[in-house]
From Swiss-Prot:
The name this protein goes by in its record: Homoserine O-acetyltransferase
Coiled-coil regions listed: none
Subcellular location: Cytoplasm
Species this protein is from: Carboxydothermus hydrogenoformans (strain ATCC BAA-161 / DSM 6008 / Z-2901)
Function recorded in the entry: Transfers an acetyl group from acetyl-CoA to L-homoserine, forming acetyl-L-homoserine.
Binding site for substrate: 220, 350
Length: 379
């Protein structure tokens, strides 16, 4: 899919304060972000990409030539790619509460000179969007061509559509929901428990200590199970075992390959993510409900004004396709412009981070339509 954006850098901007839904303020507040492409003179060719739970602002390219891995959606961003940097100005920021440069629980609280820890205020998806709005205005953007996100990123995109419709021309919500299901809340609760019962969590005041490595790893293992599908596990691992002798087989320490993979993923996250951030973002997802404090759920969905593309994944265990379809159905019932496309993939929820070649023409088509470069949508 054509060219890379090459070497990029993460930038930061600090704002005086932000007032949160809970009524508390964070002052000052810093946002880490990356941009790709150029903003046009009218300031209306911007696309906002919104990351998922353990993501960051580094969508595409590399920070150093020797980096082995590019940004998390690299095949989708660059010259000639769906998010074409010859046409669009792409922006992605680390969410409020994050641990990749934006103010979060691991940041220093200026009032104490120590990390916020669990004294950090409770944040919501709406708070994340309000901070992103500050960034968008700071960058001189007058109109966002599309707010695009998968999973927790899709939650942000939907809130953008409700909170700032005058700034937005369209929404692409991928493998997400307009309110987190009880099923999703249940898995989050178990992940939270894994972290908070680790003795090294220390009530969230673990900075300077080892930290809840085992608890965070376990939370990640639980999450990874929900991001895949039965068929993907079958294809990749089956019942392959790591034992070499019968003595090893009949032991509690022997493992199947799938177990090794889960441990690997858990340990991998521990090396790059803050446990308290994980807790705060899970809570923000739990609180996500586009109708909360606004009215009846389906009626609030009908109030969304911007053209919307919802993408579901046929094997998504965590956000089944009915959750995307109900958004589109409500909008169509209200005579709004809404489209649904289903990605067929064995990879489950994670397919939106894997199936680039399948998604590319759909996203390109929709963005070209929204930008006025084509009269119809063909998919």
């Amino acid at each position: 899919m054509n060219g890379s954006v090459g070497i990029v850098e993460t930038k930061k901007v600090t704002f005086p304060e932000i007032t949160l839904e809970c009524g508390e303020k964070i002052a000052p507040v810093t946002v880490a972000y990356e941009t790709y492409g150029e903003l046009n003179e009218r300031g209306d060719n911007a696309i906002l990409i919104l990351h998922a739970l353990t993501g960051d602002a580094h969508v595409a390219g590399k920070h150093r030539p020797e980096d082995k891995v590019a940004g998390w959606w690299d095949p989708m961003v660059g010259p000639g790619r769906p998010f074409d940097t010859n046409k669009y100005f792409i922006v992605c920021s680390n969410v409020l509460g994050g641990c990749y440069g934006t103010t979060g629980p691991s940041s220093i609280n200026p009032a104490t000179g120590r990390p916020w820890g669990m004294s950090f205020p409770i944040i919501t998806i709406r708070d994340m969007v309000n901070l992103q709005y500050k960034l968008v205005r700071h960058l001189g953007i007058t109109k966002i061509l599309a707010a695009v996100g998968g999973s927790m990123g899709g939650m942000q995109a939907l809130e953008w559509a409700y909170m700032y419709p005058e700034m937005l021309k369209s929404v692409v919500a991928i493998a997400t929901s307009a309110r987190l299901s009880p099923f999703g809340i249940a898995f989050n609760a178990v992940g939270r428990e894994a972290i908070m019962t680790d003795p090294e969590w220390r009530g969230g005041n673990y900075y300077g200590f080892e930290g809840p490595k085992r608890g965070l790893a376990l939370a990640r293992m639980i999450g990874i199970i929900t991001y895949k599908s039965d068929i993907s596990w079958q294809y990749r691992f089956g019942r392959t075992h790591t034992y070499e002798t019968d003595q090893e087989l009949f032991s509690h320490t022997s493992r199947f390959e799938i177990e090794n993979y889960l441990y690997y993923q858990g340990d991998k996250l521990v090396k790059r993510f803050d446990a308290n951030t994980y807790l705060y973002l899970l809570k923000a997802m739990d609180l996500h409900d586009i109708s909360r404090g606004r009215g009846r759920y389906r009626e609030i969905l009908k109030e969304l004004k911007t053209p919307l593309l919802a993408i579901g994944i046929d094997t998504d265990f965590l956000y089944p396709t009915y959750q995307q379809k109900e958004i589109v159905e409500a909008l169509k019932e209200a005579k709004k412009e809404a489209y649904y496309w289903e990605l067929s993939s064995p990879h489950g929820h994670d397919a939106f981070l894997i199936e680039f070649s399948k998604m590319a023409p759909i996203l390109s088509n929709f963005l070209e339509y929204v930008a006025g470069r084509r009269a119809t949508i063909n998919f």
